[in-house]
Amino acid sequence: MEGESVKPSPQPTEQAGDGEKNRRMITVNPAHMGKAFKVMNELRSKRLLCDVMIVAEDVEVEAHRVVLAACSPYFCAMFTGDMSESKAKKIEIKDVDGQTLSKLIDYIYTAEIEVTEENVQVLLPAASLLQLMDVRQNCCDFLQSQLHPTNCLGIRAFADVHTCTDLLQQANAYAEQHFPEVMLGEEFLSLSLDQVCSLISSDKLTVSSEEKVFEAVISWINYEKETRLDHMAKLMEHVRLPLLPRDYLVQTVEEEALIKNNNTCKDFLIEAMKYHLLPLDQRLLIKNPRTKPRTPVSLPKVMIVVGGQAPKAIRSVECYDFEEGRWDQIAELPSRRCRAGVVFMAGHVYAVGGFNGSLRVRTVDVYDGVKDQWTSIASMQERRSTLGAAVLNDLLYAVGGFDGSTGLASVEAYSYKTNEWFFVAPMNTRRSSVGVGVVEGKLYAVGGYDGASRQCLSTVEQYNPATNEWIYVADMSTRRSGAGVGVLSGQLYATGGHDGPLVRKSVEVYDPGTNTWKQVADMNMCRRNAGVCAVNGLLYVVGGDDGSCNLASVEYYNPVTDKWTLLPTNMSTGRSYAGQWVSASGA
């Protein structure tokens, strides 16, 4: 064709015995089909050689039977079968609007089509009718890319009606993964009873607390209270009340009028109260749908390790992909930071306070995993390094720490909704190098260093946000400053730390139900100033130092076997005083 040269391979010299094989050559012109369709479309636009007119509503489109039949099994069956349309010059297509039909026939000739929010809901069923499966798939891909907490349930319903199996599964998974946002929308409130039950009964529902599920049920009932009131018991059957903190059961669930006025719901509440009275080992023996923790698949989880000392304060941030089993570098901190508190809240990672190599800071940086970038938000009221940080009831708590001259007993909280910090009740003891964790709606401050007495601490304090008070609970068996603290299965773990020059590898665990500590297996290595997080029923301890050098290794604890195992892959940088957290990738 004009403008194109197809270069044949050199003609091989015929050898004895080669015969016919060496007198033939096959060439392929990859542009031939595209050019042919371009010419056919030009002929169509000029109404040349057209032999059929396709009509929908008031739109008439002239075309070539052979082209339509070649690209659409629907038209192929129509034109090659015994139906009257096989010979008709004018064919009407019902259940498709004229503009959509025109776009799809354009696609047959050009292989181009624009999918938009405005046309996708008519384009997909029309493509399905004409059996243009690549267009149908493009529509599904577009809808999948548009999934949002405000529309995922509508897209799920649309996919169900049109038998788009993959899209249906993707939309359902999205709704489960983003349930705290989905439950606030009009689509959730408009679901049928069976649809709500199906959603909230899923083990894969991703919620930070069962409180969200309870709140969703109350919201759905109240949206059309008169017609939905009788459904309360059926819905509460799927709310895992035993997994809620005792304070929440007493102060919120028991006081809810919809619960008070329903005997079956009161029975569910009593079941939860009795569950909380049992020792932990007996709770584990109770097996029913309401005592089973949810196991959300969510998005692939990553462990993010932020800054640290290596040996000076660094900006480096690494993330570990649990599915791939590898470490990757992600966006660096805006400035060097070690000895910070790090938490995951509202879909973002927060790095709070710390030490920049010369000064203790009160600044806070937030990481957006979608954009892979850090931004700064409101600073704390006080400078803090070696602080503890945790999230409780949608507030970020900064606990204790060191301001450059003295250890701190003060505690402040941050609301991401108002971007403001405010003080809450101080601890009873100044604590720097303190570990913190949240269990059953209470905040715990574990060990640390009291600058006044110059001693490492074995004491532990508990904060109740409802009363704004700190009280002492049972001491650890040993003094620990710089202990890594994490929460697993409703228990508080204190790992490693040091008492003076002695760096520990011992680990003890606190049961709030009995107010007691017990020893579990030692770690493989002595560690202080390490990060700790829980993932899929395992407790991970990241980095730290052993008293002589910073560590790049990571080990995890399995409570079922009471064993620690070293992760096969180390971080790229040995670091202590790093903060780390686990989030969903892309969060």
Curated annotation (Swiss-Prot):
It comes from the Eukaryota. Phosphorylation at Ser-433 by PKA or PKC decreases the interaction with WNK1 and WNK4, leading to inhibit their degradation by the BCR(KLHL3) complex. Phosphorylated at Ser-433 by PKC in response to angiotensin II signaling, decreasing ability to promote degradation of WNK1 and WNK4, leading to activation of Na-Cl cotransporter SLC12A3/NCC. Phosphorylation at Ser-433 is increased by insulin. Dephosphorylated at Ser-433 by calcineurin PPP3CA, promoting degradation of WNK1 and WNK4. One of its GO terms (cellular component) is Cul3-RING ubiquitin ligase complex. Residues 1-24 are annotated as: Disordered. Residues 152-254 form the BACK domain. InterPro entries: BACK, BTB-kelch_protein, BTB/POZ_dom, Kelch-typ_b-propeller, Kelch_1, KLHL3_BACK, SKP1/BTB/POZ_sf. Substrate-specific adapter of a BCR (BTB-CUL3-RBX1) E3 ubiquitin ligase complex that acts as a regulator of ion transport in the distal nephron. The BCR(KLHL3) complex acts by mediating ubiquitination and degradation of WNK1 and WNK4, two activators of Na-Cl cotransporter SLC12A3/NCC in distal convoluted tubule cells of kidney, thereby regulating NaCl reabsorption. The BCR(KLHL3) complex also mediates ubiquitination and degradation of WNK3. Homodimer. Component of the BCR(KLHL3) E3 ubiquitin ligase complex, at least composed of CUL3 and KLHL3 and RBX1. Interacts with CLDN8. This is Kelch-like protein 3.
